[in-house]
């Protein structure tokens, strides 16, 4: 193969990869704008986390609570009323100033705040035995690996005997159900089940079934960084955090009128669609370049 042809191949591939990266970066900018849009529409101003992070301080500092004490300024030393911890959690981080500021920011929303439980029901998954798994059927078991941020992926499927769908009606996953991971590395991540395939829910996952909320709005809200932090705050466990359905339903969220929820959901959906188009364009650009290179090689 001539040197000129080799160089041309290199240029085509490099150009395609560059265009793909540009498309992906543009798509990511769109996706990153969703959180700011949602927070802005709700009137939530985020506290600056660095202002409340524990810092190393001089060992000679006094432990009084005056405002000029560095421990107080950095949120490492604070007071909590006994009534707030009696019969409740006593881990200090739960009552940290940063978490209190997050809650205050949410309560300062343009809209009233209510617990998720006032508008949604919750169903925990069932502990199906791995001995019941089979190679193929029309009954899918949704496990924690299927629940990602904003999406329920069915690329890897686990199957149960078909009759289980009728045997365990309580644990059926319905189309447009909001699913949440309740343990492990993806704890707190929520996604909407957009399939009509028959599915049951495995243990340590939950269904948040909305009564009169826009599910897409709720999904994007719970996937906000501040809500992911609140979910972790309400979790328990050492090496592996776990959260219960009861704790999830206690979380307060802004409740705009349904029309406003629908408006925000539509806008966010449009942003995601544009981002998906850009991602697909990037893939197609690279694929066309590969085909062009293949033709050049075969032609020589």
Please provide the spans of the model-predicted regions.
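A short glycine-rich beta-alpha junction/loop motif
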Residues: 1-4, 198-206, 213-216, 236-262
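Non-catalytic DNA-recognition/assembly elements of restriction-modification systems
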Residues: 2-127, 250, 254-300
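Short helix/loop capping segments that flank catalytic or ligand/cofactor-binding pockets
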Residues: 7-8, 150-152, 189-190, 216-217
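Short coil/turn segments at secondary-structure boundaries
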Residues: 48-53, 129-137, 156, 233-235
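Sequence-specific dsDNA recognition surfaces
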Residues: 113-132, 145-175
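A short beta-sheet element
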Residues: 143-144, 165-171, 175-223
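Flexible, active-site-proximal loop/turn residues at the rims of small-molecule/cofactor binding pockets
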Residues: 148, 185, 257
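Short amphipathic beta-strand starts and helix->beta connectors
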Residues: 192, 234-237
């Amino acid at each position: 193969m001539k040197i000129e042809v080799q160089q041309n191949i290199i240029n085509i591939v490099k150009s395609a990869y560059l265009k793909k990266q540009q498309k992906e970066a543009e798509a990511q900018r769109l996706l990153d704008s969703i959180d700011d849009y949602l927070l802005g529409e709700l009137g939530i101003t985020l506290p600056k986390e660095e202002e409340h992070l524990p810092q190393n301080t001089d060992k000679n500092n006094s432990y009084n609570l005056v405002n000029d004490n560095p421990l107080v300024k950095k949120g490492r030393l604070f007071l909590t009323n006994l009534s707030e911890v009696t019969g409740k959690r006593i881990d200090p981080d739960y009552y940290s100033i940063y978490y209190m500021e997050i809650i205050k920011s949410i309560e300062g929303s343009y809209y009233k705040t209510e617990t998720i439980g006032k508008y949604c029901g919750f169903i925990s998954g069932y502990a199906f035995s791995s001995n019941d798994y089979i190679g193929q059927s029309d009954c899918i078991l949704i496990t924690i690996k299927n629940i990602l941020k904003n999406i329920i992926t069915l690329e890897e499927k686990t199957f149960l005997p078909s009759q289980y769908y009728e045997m365990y009606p309580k644990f059926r996953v319905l189309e447009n159900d909001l699913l949440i991971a309740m343990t492990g590395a993806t704890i707190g991540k929520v996604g909407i089940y957009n399939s009509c395939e028959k599915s049951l829910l495995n243990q340590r996952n939950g269904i948040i079934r909305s009564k009169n909320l826009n599910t897409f709005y709720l999904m994007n809200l719970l996937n906000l960084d501040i809500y992911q932090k609140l979910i972790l705050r309400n979790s328990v466990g050492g090496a592996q955090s776990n959260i219960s359905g009861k704790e999830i339903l206690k979380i307060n969220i802004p409740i705009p009128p349904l029309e406003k929820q629908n408006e925000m959901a539509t806008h966010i959906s449009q942003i995601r669609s544009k981002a998906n188009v850009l991602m697909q364009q990037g893939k197609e650009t690279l694929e066309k370049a590969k085909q062009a290179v293949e033709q050049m090689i075969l032609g020589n």
